UniProtKB/Swiss-Prot annotation:
Lineage start: Eukaryota, Metazoa, Chordata, Craniata, Vertebrata
Role according to the record: Calmodulin-binding scaffolding protein which is the center of the striatin-interacting phosphatase and kinase (STRIPAK) complexes. STRIPAK complexes have critical roles in protein (de)phosphorylation and are regulators of multiple signaling pathways including Hippo, MAPK, nuclear receptor and cytoskeleton remodeling. Different types of STRIPAK complexes are involved in a variety of biological processes such as cell growth, differentiation, apoptosis, metabolism and immune regulation.
Basic residues biased stretches: 338-351
SMART domains: WD40
Tissue localization of expression: Mainly expressed in brain but is also expressed at low levels in various tissues such as kidney, spleen, skeletal muscle and lung.
Modified residues (Phosphothreonine): 225
Coiled coil feature spans: 53-120
Region of interest (Calmodulin-binding), residue spans: 149-166
Source organism per UniProt: Mus musculus (Mouse)
Family the UniProt entry places it in: Belongs to the WD repeat striatin family.
Subcellular location field: Cytoplasm; Membrane; Cell projection, Dendritic spine
Predominant cellular place of this UniProt entry's protein: cytoplasm
Full protein name: Striatin
Length: 780
């Protein structure tokens, strides 16, 4: 029997009680055999060869995916590390550069302090050891430059390793070259040395005069430039400041190459001039250039258009080809310097010699045709001139004029000879027109001696726009009126140094507080003991001015406020003080002009324009030529003169009033000339107009600014007019010629407004401006 038939078969043959099972027989045997085969088949199917292969392939694919993800993450992290390293290196370079700048500025500041102290006090300022700043980066660069005696193989290996590092970081050689050239261009360095050497190589190959000395010099130069290029790239990464040391190294190598070739020849010195040579030496060398041209004319022919080939050719020749005696050259140099010193002291010829010279120059046909001297390359412009002009120049040299290389000897400037030899108006000069030129010179001298105003003080204590200002008639004191409801008094002699500039700041010595709204105008009495202000509250406040030397922190003095002048029902726009009658004029938005007695706080003495037939007054002033008259401008564009004693309107000045447009004809300010019967008005349409007070006719009109003209002031002598505008500019005008002689920007815009008022000091050299930017500025 087969042993592998199963356990059922084995037990049925040997067990003594198996006879009861024999009745089932073949069915039981078949069932038992089927169960055993199924269990064995299931065990074998779990570890089949295809399943194992499939499992291995699946696991390998999963491993490859995870490995790819790991590689991507590794590459990203490496890129991030490289980026951060580059960023760190850039920050370090920036820090080094900033430290160098700080040290440089500190050193410059110490020098300026010492210079200022020496100029002011005449003694040296003791600041300790004033040594030029030493930079750590420079010391590091010097230590890096020292090991230059390495072999060529070491340089190549270092260069290759550096290129590999740069490629990993993300830089390439091209980017480095571009950045290096850009930095050099910004710093003002140039690579003239390499260009010069390339030109020398080309010329030497063309001329066929290559020398062994030149070859050895160029071999040494190539080795040095090979190493210098590596240092250039490395130092560019280290710091931007190392370019200076690289340039110094290039200059040193250039000096070594220059020392290999004989430096005793004139041509070599001409090709690579030494910076220590002075101007006289260079000009002396130019005088001997004819030696070079004559020598070349015997040996070979040169093209007429090329004037520099002779320099390049002779650089490769040996010094024995010239046989130049250096002693003779030095003697000629000294002689030339003495001649130049003698020519510097030559005086101009007198008038008779000039007239004779002019007469000779006008007779072109009678001049003899002299042969020009030997042409030298040092005078390229002389070859372009005709022979007649050269002959004239030679004649002029006999009149002790210095030679001018083909340019006009009378003009003495850079213009070339024009028609009539560039004489222009000098050719027609006669005795008759001397008076005209004298008057012209006098006018020019007046303009040259004219004072130029410069900003001196900035007054910064107000919190809102400054509407008006007034100077004390005698003292350097200024009062400003602001939209912050206050007036402030400033002593221009009590200054304090400003925080951020060299200018001086002034602090207010007193603040006037009584108005219940913005203060629009202010005026001072003739003796400076009282001042008056008007505001939007319709009140005119009368003040007693304090002592200019008062302590700003003194106790409050109630006697400063004298009391209000009541009568106006709307904002007071303008004030004017009459010193002759001690009267005060005011104009208000209620349409009236009022005359007040300043000696007492009382109602107005008289009221003008009560029916508002001319409109609402905007500005008022006293007529200086007639103290009993006043002039006022109105919103409808009219300007009228009133008699204060009779309260009658005397004259209405000529005006082109457009009834359809109110803004175009608006007059912002009217003032009277201090000595002449002239009224001047400032208009919203950018014009300034001048009127005759006797006839009312318009004398002159001009567009004075880019935007509306807001304020006017005339100096006490009546020579100059100052105007302010919303275009942020102040302009100073000559009243005689009606021309602008100075313009300066004083304030910034705020709500499309800029300058509200300008003023001259009555007795001192001050002018002031008030702006919408809450600043008042004083000019001297």
């Amino acid at each position: 029997m087969d042993e592998q038939a199963g356990p059922g078969v084995f037990f049925s043959n040997n067990h003594p009680g198996a006879g009861g099972a024999k009745g089932l027989g073949p069915l039981a045997e078949a069932a038992a055999a089927g169960d055993g085969a199924a269990a064995a088949g299931a065990a074998r199917a779990q570890y089949s060869l295809p399943g194992i292969l499939h499992f291995l392939q699946h696991e390998w694919a999963r491993f490859e995916v995870e490995r790819a993800q790991w590689e991507v993450e590794r590459a990203e992290l490496q890129a991030q590390i490289a980026f951060l390293q580059g960023e760190r290196k850039g920050q370090e370079n920036l820090k080094k550069d900033l430290v160098r700048r700080i040290k440089m500025l500190e050193y410059a500041l110490k020098q300026e302090r010492a210079k200022y102290h020496k100029l002011k006090y005449g003694t040296e300022l003791n600041q300790g050891d004033m040594k030029p700043p030493s930079y750590d980066s420079d010391e590091g660069n010097e230590t890096e430059v020292q090991p230059q005696q390495n072999s060529q193989l070491m340089w190549k290996q270092g260069r290759q390793l550096l290129r590999q590092y740069l490629q990993e970081v993300g830089y390439t050689d091209t980017i480095l070259d571009v950045k290096s050239k850009r930095v050099r261009a910004l710093l003002g360095f140039s690579s003239d040395v390499t260009d010069r050497e390339d030109d020398k190589n080309q010329d030497s190959v063309i001329n066929g005069t290559e020398a062994e000395v030149k070859e050895t010099a160029m071999i040494g130069k190539s080795e040095l430039t090979d190493s210098a290029s590596v240092l250039d790239n490395f130092k560019f990464l280290e710091s931007a400041a190392a370019d200076v040391s690289d340039e110094d190294e290039d200059e040193d190598t250039d000096g070594r190459a220059k020392s290999v070739i004989d430096t005793s020849t004139i041509v070599r010195k001409k090709a690579l001039p030494d910076t220590s040579e002075d101007r006289d030496t260079k000009e002396a060398l130019k005088e001997f250039d004819f030696l070079v041209t004559s020598e070349e004319g015997d040996n070979e022919s040169r093209s007429a258009g090329d004037g520099t080939d002779w320099e390049k050719e002779d650089q490769c020749l040996t010094p024995e080809a010239w046989n130049v005696d250096q002693g003779v050259i030095s003697k000629l140099k000294e002689q030339y310097k003495k001649e130049r010193k003698g020519k510097k002291g030559v005086k101009r010829p007198n008038r008779s010699k000039l007239q004779d010279m002019l007469a000779n120059l006008r007779d072109v046909d009678e001049l003899p045709s002299l042969q020009p001297s030997v042409g030298s390359p040092s005078r390229p412009s002389s070859s372009r001139l005709p022979e007649q002009e050269l002959s004239r120049a030679d004649e002029v040299e006999a009149l002790t004029f210095p030679p001018s290389s083909g340019k006009s000897f009378i003009m003495g400037a850079d213009e070339a000879l024009e028609s009539e030899l560039g004489l222009g108006e000098l050719a027609g000069l006669t005795v008759a027109n001397e008076a005209d030129s004298l008057a012209y010179d006098i006018a020019n001298n007046k303009d040259a001696l004219r004072k130029t105003w410069n900003p001196k003080f900035t007054l910064r204590s107000h919190f809102d726009g400054i509407r008006a200002l007034a100077f004390h008639p005698i003292e350097p004191v200024l009062i400003t009126a602001s939209e912050d409801h206050t007036l402030k008094m400033w002593n221009l002699q009590k200054t304090a140094p400003a925080k951020k500039s060299t200018s001086l700041d002034v602090e207010p010595i007193y603040t006037f507080r009584a108005h219940k709204g913005p203060v629009l105008c202010v005026v001072m009495s003739s003796n400076g003991e009282q001042c008056y202000s008007g505001g939007t509250d319709g009140r005119i406040q009368s003040w007693s001015t304090t002592n200019p030397n008062v302590d700003p922190y003194d106790a409050y003095d109630p006697s400063v406020l004298r009391g209000p002048l009541l009568g106006h029902t709307d904002a007071v726009w303008g004030l004017a003080y009459s010193a002759a009658h001690q009267r005060l004029l005011s104009c208000s938005a209620d349409g009236t002009l009022r005359l007040w007695n300043t000696t007492e706080v009382a109602p107005a003495l008289s009221v003008f324009n009560d029916n508002q037939e001319l409109g609402i007054p905007a500005s008022v002033d006293l007529v200086s030529s007639d103290p009993s008259h006043m002039v006022a401008s109105f919103s409808k564009g009219y300007t009228s003169i009133f008699n204060m004693e009779t309260q009658q309107r005397v004259l209405t000045l000529e005006s082109n009033v457009d009834s359809t447009s109110s803004s175009s004809c608006q007059i912002n300010r009217v003032i009277s000339h201090p000595t002449l019967p002239i009224s001047i008005t400032a208009h919203e349409d950018r014009h300034i107009k001048f009127y005759d007070n006797n006839t009312g006719k318009l004398i002159h009109s001009m567009v004075a600014h880019l935007e509306a003209v807001t304020s006017l002031a005339v100096d006490p002598n009546g020579l100059y007019l100052m105007s302010g505008s919303h275009d942020c500019s102040i302009r100073l005008w000559n009243l005689e010629s009606k021309t602008c002689i100075q313009e300066f920007t004083a304030h910034r815009k705020k709500f499309e407004e800029s300058i509200h008022d300008v003023a001259f000091h009555p007795s001192k050299c001050y002018i002031a401006s008030a702006g919408a930017d809450a600043l008042a500025k004083v000019f001297v």
